[in-house]
From Swiss-Prot:
GO terms for cellular component: mismatch repair complex. Belongs to the DNA mismatch repair MutL/HexB family. Gene3D superfamilies: 3.30.230.10, Histidine kinase-like ATPase, C-terminal domain, MutL, C-terminal domain, dimerisation subdomain, MutL, C-terminal domain, regulatory subdomain. InterPro entries: DNA_mismatch_repair_CS, DNA_mismatch_repair_MutL, DNA_mismatch_S5_2-like, HATPase_C_sf, MutL/Mlh/PMS, MutL/Mlh/Pms-like, MutL_C, MutL_C_dimsub. Keywords: DNA damage, DNA repair. GO terms for biological process: mismatch repair. This is DNA mismatch repair protein MutL. CDD domains: HATPase_MutL-MLH-PMS-like, MutL_Trans. SUPFAM superfamilies: ATPase domain of HSP90 chaperone/DNA topoisomerase II/histidine kinase (SSF55874), DNA mismatch repair protein MutL (SSF118116), Ribosomal protein S5 domain 2-like (SSF54211). GO terms for molecular function: ATP binding; ATP hydrolysis activity; ATP-dependent DNA damage sensor activity; mismatched DNA binding. Transmembrane segments: none annotated. This protein is involved in the repair of mismatches in DNA. It is required for dam-dependent methyl-directed DNA mismatch repair. May act as a 'molecular matchmaker', a protein that promotes the formation of a stable complex between two or more DNA-binding proteins in an ATP-dependent manner without itself being part of a final effector complex.
Amino acid sequence: MSDIIHLLPDSVANQIAAGEVIQRPASVIKELVENAIDAEAQNIHVLVTDAGKTCIQVIDDGKGMSETDARLSFERHATSKIREASDLFALRTMGFRGEALASIAAVAQVELKTRPESEELGTKIIIAGSKVESQEAVSCPKGSNFSIKNLFFNIPARRKFLKANSTELSNILAEFERIALVHPEVAFSLYSNDSELFNLPACHLRQRILSVFGKKLNQQLLSVEVNTTMVKVSGYVAKPETARKKGAHQYFFVNGRYMRHPYFHKAVMDAYEQLIPAGEQISYFIYFEVDPANIDVNIHPTKTEIKFENEQAIWQILSASIKESLGKFNAVPSIDFDTEDMPDIPAFEQNLPPAPPKVHFNSDFNPFKPSSSSGGGNYSRPKVDWEDLYGGLEKASKMNQPFSDSDPESEEFAVIEEESIATAAPETLYAGELAVIEKGTQHLQFKGRFILTSVKSGLMLIDQHRAHIRVLFDRYRAQIQQKQGFSQGVLFPEILQLPASEAAVLQSIMDDLSAVGFDLSDLGGGSYAINGVPSGIDGLNPVDLVRSMLHTAMEKGNDVKEEIQDILALTLARAAAIVYGQVLSNEEMVSLVDNLFACPSPNYTPDGRVVLTTIKEEEIDKLFR
């Protein structure tokens, strides 16, 4: 039997490794910028073309590399960060595996120019698909200049699955923001297709946060600071009143490295318990400093999942420190006593003797005299107008089963004449049967949530909020497709401030927002003026509405225009729909039901939730047997 096991060529092995380390253009930028930080660079410039698909360039003024180091840096597991296994437990650098450059060179065309400060000439290396094409001396500034062209040029399947430019650029911006937030002492700049997106000078942490996410955040941040023998926790959390359902800026960093940690996220939310509505999120920027020996960063290729040795204790410290900050800055709501209707109590004058209290009594009262109301025999119960409780019910023909004329309850069993709903309603509305609204019926509202109405097969219950979402979704969807949305101008334009990562996504959906009725103008620097909103959304905050649609689009990451249009229509419908608890008149309920049954799919909301259900007449009869 011949041997079948053999070693893979380095180029193939590097491509396999690149599948874990390099997933998209943002991964390349993360690895190169982190290497620049490890090289003690003070200024880092990032330039991308076509969201990094065509070219990524990272320029730094760090230590640079010698000719030998420049060539060796592209070999697998070649690194200057560690020398032995024990160094893994004392890591202070961003990288340590020596895989990044080898992985990048395996799937792209790489050009490196680098020079250490001690040498007059630098080195230029060109590598494509792990093969060194040339290496020569060149004149260049101190530091390193990486140019990554045609990412995944030799793996068409990987390149085909890259997202649209707007999505990939959003991922680049998100990765860039994470690195910039954890290294405020370094100056960063980011350009996309020769357009400047970020220009961040070296500064303090709070100023860096405001430079990335806007100065409006300055009034919302509370500082957090605690130092123990186990961990040092610092950073900022937002005030409770800034909580939102989507779009909160939530960042954890440990020893200068970004991380995701759901367990510590629960600690933050525990500190805000009963301070923010359920389901809403709060912004925070939390920085941990711990002994490197007490954490393990080598459990995931992207190094964003980190294991702590004392997670439970740190959980308690984190939650307590945030609670302390909320109390110290008076962020916890205080008891507000309403003095509007309180009696005016005059100040006590010590010179005057206190007046005795006045007692009112009936001098003619005789407890032994019989009273006409005693004994309870003549007690009359308070009158209850039962007819008002059922005023909305019209009695018509009796039930099919006859009752005796002497039966006093026979007239309570009444039904309402039947009439077909509008022809626009589908023939198979529910369970394959034709739903028929009873003639002349007055719809009833139950608990401010459901609309009850009589149909041919029994009693129909309609969720008023979901029904309105169904109606509005179809309306807004048609407006977006036909670009016939009506815009209503606002007297004072609202200003929307966005970080660069969100602004890039907003630009990609701007046409769809205009189609539904929004009028936005770009003021530059991530600021947008909302000059007009869709008609019919009176009372809604246009800034929150645009943010909601923006963050939904970011979460979905859709590249198909129709799907983005559905997202916009659904978000707008949810925001504008009537809420639970809103009292509706009979005319409003009739209009809502008619519009619902005119929809192509009245049974379900666009996201698949049930809108209506029917209790069959036979099931109701069984309840009275």
